[in-house]
Curated annotation (Swiss-Prot):
The keyword Transcription applies. This is DNA-directed RNA polymerase subunit beta. The keyword Nucleotidyltransferase applies. It comes from the Bacteria.
Amino acid sequence: MGQLTKKFGKIDVSLPIPHLLNLQVDSYVKFLQEGATERRHDEGLEGVFRSVFPIEDFNRTASLEFVSYEVGEPKYDQPECISKGLTYEAPIRIKVRLVVYDVDEDSGNRTIRDIKEQEIYFGTLPLMTEKGTFIINGTERVIVNQLQRSPGIIFEHDSGKTHSSRKVLYSCRIIPMRGSWLDFDFDHKDILYVRIDRRRKMPATILFKAMGMSKTDILDYFYKKEFYRLDPMGRLMWEVQKDMYRKDSAFVDIEDGKGGTIVKAGKPITKRAWRLISEAGLETIEVAPDTIEGMFLAEDIVNPATGEVLAEAADEITASLVENLREAGISRLPVLHTKGLETSSSLRDTLVLDKTPDMEAAQVEIYRRLRPSSPPTPEIAASFFDNLFRSADYYDLSPVGRYKLNQRLGIDQSVDLRTLTDDDILRAIRVLLHLKDSHGPADDIDHLGNRRVRPVGELVENQYRIGLVRMERAIKERMSLQEVSTLMPHDLINPKPVAAVLKEFFGTSQLSQFMDQTNALSEVTHKRRLSALGPGGLTRERAGFEVRDVHTSHYGRICPIETPEGPNIGLIVSLTTYAKVNDFGFIETPYRIIREGALTDEIKFLDASREQGEVVAQANAAVDADGKLADEYVTARVRGDVLMSHRDEVTLMDISPSQMVSISAALIPFLEHDDANRALMGSNMQRQAVPLLRSEKPIVGTGMEGDVARDSGACILAEGPGIVRYADATRIIVSYENGLYPDRGGVRAYDLQKYHKSNQNSCFGQRPTCHPGQIVKKGDVLADGPGIEDGELALGKNLVVAFMPWCGYNFEDSILISERVVKEDVFTSIHIEEFEVVARDTKLGPEEITRDIPNVGEDMLRNLDGSGIIRIGASVKPDDILVGKITPKGETQLTPEEKLLRAIFGDKARDVKNTSLKVPPGIEGTIIDVKVFNRRSGEKDERTRNIEDYETARIDKKEQDHVRALGDALRDRLADTLVGKQIAVTLPGKRKGEVLAEAGAPMTRELLDALPVKRLAGLFKSREVDEMVDTALEDYDRQVAFLKGIYDSKREKVTEGDDLPPGVIKMVKVHIAVKRKLNVGDKMAGRHGNKGVVSCILPEEDMPFFADGRPVDIVLNPLGVPSRMNIGQIMETHLGWGAKELGRQLAEMLDSGAAMATLRHEVKDVFRSATIAKLVDEMDDETFRKAVSKLRTGIVTKTPVFDGASEEDIWSWIERAGMDGDGKTVLYDGRTGDKFYNRVTTGVMYILKLHHLVDEKIHARSTGPYSLVTQQPLGGKAQFGGQRLGEMEVWALEAYGASYLLQEFLTVKSDDVTGRVKMYEKIVKGDNFLEAGLPESFNVLVKELMSLGLNVTLHQEEGKKRPKRVGFMSAL
């Protein structure tokens, strides 16, 4: 049935929101490549194995090669892993091949001697659930995606901060995924240095020489040459080259050869003149003799007669050198082109500084810098240098790094080339030199084109590689120690290093986090989170303001609002609603393509780098009927700046206004009217909302509620078109069409979660929303999850709110709330606490779980069964026994009396202590579940047998329901064929003499439904029909057998016992459901960052009320709005009020019996939507009545962020509902009945109850544990600690002169051990004297001084009297 919902959004979004968990799920699927049958892609797990294998021994006589891997089926399903505290994992088997070679000692050639192939068990790998989580040791965890600096190349400068001269120093860094970092940087003298792996720097030309380049090669690559001729007459001639223009003055008149003068002597040579010189065909121009001085030679100058090197390349040219060269008969000088253009001599200067003569010396020098301890040979140095950047074993740029390198340096290399080439390095230096000489802008390291996401698959892949590399070393050692020809592959491979690395990563890594499971939104948000922290990332202390700040490239990719408030602000962020992560790990956002000012239906996803040159219009830009941009100039984004651009220049357009925010922020209506700080709080606090007893979706929503609820995994969704065969509170069975689940006849059973404990102890339960016989299509909601109503997120309640002060009870954001809210359980939530007790085998004997506990009265045992375990349904309070347990005490020497007692009463009085599991303070609730885990070989107690019988009966019923649904589905498939066909035999009924159908009668649908499925065999006259029925029944039998196998294995698991840790005999887990009603001290919040604590729960009759007698539900402080600047809450209040009143009025019309035509017209008039009008016209009267009846609590409205209801829309609704246009109402005081002096802003606001509940925080102690060292009470509720009396409290008591009270606080109530004992004795005796001793903290201070070599002793002066005793009760 269509829901009557008012949508205020004006922009038609053409793209559905991508599945919110795609990033996690797709990444792990890509890592595992589980379904691939043929050769898998060289990535993920396959890529890791291929990168480490083949493993050869040191003599190359044997090689261990990887063939393939297979992922098996997990031993336990997900619910079992959670209940038993296990990891949800699957076994991995790898097929490897051991090849043994014969090596010819003379030639070194290898010939294969033997090949052994074997499949080996290679440990287990945690599997991801369909919700994107991992179950590790029984708890659901999330691997958070890491946002880190992308591999590739980056050019930076220091903004003049490094050197005192304030000179801007440029640098360049090539970052691989794995291998040595390469840094090039200039110093203040413009010398270019290189660092490898952040070691000592050296002149960069050493690296070029090590690559095999000579001095001349280096100069030729980086500089152009210009030539000068030395005239015998002493003139200096400059050879004209078209691209060598320099703005110098002419030394002599430059003539064109036809008698004309191009440039007169002393005049500057302009670009026009240079063009005329080139066109005139002049080969040389005479220049001043000193022009060449200070330039540098481009080549070695060799005496042609003797072969002597007169001057070397890069030498500076001086007047004397020119004279010597002229005398030696040198007529033409090649010179580096460095003057006048953006080409400095820095590289030539570096070359002069570099003293290494050739490649060998350069490689040895690099080896010496990186390995200073070991003296190298040229061969070792050459091999070491080759392995630095050119070997795939030691260096991996990764496809991302190669992509970024290609993009930045303008190279066209394949992304499969993952090592660094000489050309890459040389091009990088050329770009760096150009940047330095032209003072170009550096790359922005915070730009999302330079930051990439490492999803879960890649993180696990890296860990797997670390484990495999450790294993590789062990395999090589084994190969060299043993005779390989006698070994099998399994003798070499030990998967334990891999298992250890994975266990450490999933259990303790900073990125493997305990899932935030407070509600469905918090789950989804946690999986969409990006963290800049973690291994290989930033640290909180080092991260500066720039990396935390919002960047222009974040638009549509990272939410500018949702981030934590504390020290992690800006380091932990969220993906936006439409964002996707591409194969390279860069975040992409979708845009509609615009051509010549007209919108197209094409959509393309762009990462931040590829968006650079585009002109992007906003989603709300006006578009005419032809799909063209209506305005000639539109607001657009160009390279991060917002400009007014001509419509013909616009190339792209945003998909939706909500694409710039995350899902949490997109759930805040009127977000555009809230201050960003409060919006941040609002989006964070929605994640803390506790699922309530009854969920209620917001009257004022944004349209995102359905997407979040459906994608969260908390709901059960139909997987395709089908029919609901069975539905109750615990199970739904659906038969699907379209070939889904062929092995079970298209029938799928869904078990609903009931009273499931979440990670945050909130109660997760699912409720069916479908009924038997209902026809469903793909994506329909079959069952709602916690905090979800009708497939939409429903985290709070719609309350009638008034903004007014009330006797100071809403001072400082406090909240005044009506008792009705508590009485009707509006904000009541259920929380589930789990307690566990383990019976171990101790040195003194086994612990025992029993009802027979010494020194415990029958009253304490009243709720325990015969096995000593509490019964389900019992109400418990603090200190009640949940599971009785006794532990053997150490045998002591017995007195004759004890021996006599033991002889008389037998073993009853044996030495055992009571170690029963008791309810801790602050917990009061009902036992909802008890699980007993026994060893497989152990004896089962009565409670275990009862649980097994109950579970077996449940499984039997499930099997029967499933088989029945299978039969119903079969009847539906056969009905079209069988109905109307003649029956061959008479069918008897159940009662004697009853006949269902005579022979020859036609088959009817009623008869078909009444007959058992098996009875259809051989029933019809037509042979063809019988054969078709027989074929269908064969399939049916096969499917029933398949189901029987599934249920038999479940029955077997119930009775087979459990794998318990060593030394554990039995384990019992008890779940208590605690009902938490709304209480004074509970934290509540709206969606706009408006939070507060309940200060008073006021009787309903005392609350402010309307003129018709209805009281408000909640009173908020109006002063909480202006300074916080979250005006969205006021707009939500007004729109909610209009929606509630209009819905109530329509429902009243229905109740008063208004004509259907009138009611339909009224509904259309209220909604004013063509879609709703069409829906209303299509509904029959009964469906329409139900739809209008649902509006009784208010019309559900959707106002998307940045595209929501305008002020005019809200006022028109308020006026349509017959209320005052300013949204204010006259209220009356509930205590006196008087009218309040001012009219009050009232309306409906969506309020959440947050998980900061007072019942979980309030704590009191009279006696309890003490610290061993200081003898002071411990701190905190978890330790059952005391209340700290700090120095400020001491000052307060001193100010009041309460000396005896203070003495009591600081001694007997704190750490005076002897005084405590004496106090206890005095209370027992009724004596009221305070006798304070020495506080233990004084002894600690004395010992501290002793450790510093100071001895402190106490001396009493002669003749001094001791102080008089004073009664401590009288001191009060």
